[in-house]
Amino acid sequence: MYNRYVTGQHFIGRKDERAILGNLLSQSENVVIWEPFGTGKKSLVHQVFTKMKVDGNRFSVGEMTALDIREGEAFVKRLGAAVIRLVASTPDEYEGIVTKYLEGTHFVFDRKAFSDLDVILSTNWDLDDNDLKAVLRLPYALAAERGEKTFMIIDEFQNLDLAGDGERIFKLMEQVMDEVKAEGLRIFSYIFIGSQVNAMED
């Protein structure tokens, strides 16, 4: 995906921004890019990843949108599914990851739900904070197992803040980020892209 240069008016004067973003990502720092809709945020990220590829860096990039997210738990499920799809592609592989990394949680891989609804993460009970943190730790664990830097782009992340339990999810994410940083695990990071668009406008 990130193998061609992108040019356009939005990149005039953005050389410094590209350099700063590239430096942050090379250190596996989490990044927030907050600008109005249509100002070239994704293209900026695209260019940085392209340069990283040209420079010989090996990494994986996943992407998800939070535009239609109205519940924090739905956000976590979508994030978990996006992370799993980044490293697996078959039902057996999906089930293997859920069994290995989410054992002891209320998350399961339901083959019927996957077949009927393309759902990777189903639940067998109400979710608690430990369940959610297990999924939030998943991208770090999978990246470490593969030994490859991994980035997850979350587009329109501001919608999580509008969700009823959004603050809870943000706090859990911060806890996990602090924990993995303390463990010295610097192989995964988020790129949060935000604008003024939100699901409540639908």
Q: What are these model-predicted stretches?
A:
Residues 1-34, 54-55, 198:
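A short, basic N-terminal segment
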Residues 30, 34-151, 160-161, 166, ...:
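P-loop NTPase nucleotide-binding core
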Residues 144-146, 150-153, 159-202:
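Sensor-1/coupling segment of RecA-like P-loop NTPase cores
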Residues 16-20, 135-138, 172:
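Well-ordered alpha-helical segments embedded in enzymatic catalytic cores
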Residues 19, 73, 201:
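Alpha-helical elements of the RecA-like P-loop NTPase motor core of helicases
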Residues 23, 50-54, 141, 175-178, ...:
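Short, well-ordered alpha-helices that flank and scaffold nucleotide-derived cofactor binding pockets
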Residues 13, 64, 192:
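Small/polar loops that bind or transfer phosphate-bearing groups
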